[in-house]
Amino acid sequence: MKVTMTEAICQEGLALLEGKADIFVAHDAHPHNYLDQLKDTDAFIVRVADKGAIDKETMESSDSLKVIGRTGIGYDSVDVESATKLGIPVVVTPGANNRSVAEHAITLMLALSKNMVESDVEQRKGNWKIRDAKKAFEVEEKTCLIIGLGTIGKIIAHLCIGLDMKVIGYDTFLSKEQMAELGVEKY
């Protein structure tokens, strides 16, 4: 069995495949750049790819493709209609990286509050006065608006509340009462 990946997955995932499959990691989100490598691919794991990148031509370049797996929850990068017509199931990994995505969002928010990127660049140049040029601020008692309180939005809200932030949420599927249970004020 041959498994092709647009890019490497986590070590735990690779360990599950060890000894069970030949693995080709393309390190390229554009399968058209390596169609010749897909000829005998049985499974295609898509981590990152442009919208529609896994198209009919990509699928047909393998004479043995049995499944397309997309890490995450979106199907944007896969032409699901063509896969369905070709009898190739497309699967996703819902929930697998929810916490990581939420933590990444919080990390970016904290980096912005402290001007981390610009400060890092300037301090590496020896410009220590950047601290005075751009004022950093604490997020405590600041307000965070979260649009969409699905699984990831709820985790972000929980983390923000843990940072003593006020959280306002907009979600057409949750009532004011449901949001209040999360500690979120409905927008």
Task: Describe the residue ranges of each PLM region.
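Short loop/helix-cap segments at secondary-structure boundaries that form the rim of catalytic
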Residues: 12-19, 35-36, 78-85, 174-182
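Rossmann-like dinucleotide/phosphate-binding beta-alpha-beta segment
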Residues: 133-187
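Phosphate/diphosphate ligand-binding glycine-rich loop within oxidoreductases
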Residues: 7, 42-123, 136
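Conserved hydrophobic/aromatic pocket- or pore-lining residues that grip, position, or stack substrates
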Residues: 83, 105, 126, 148, ...
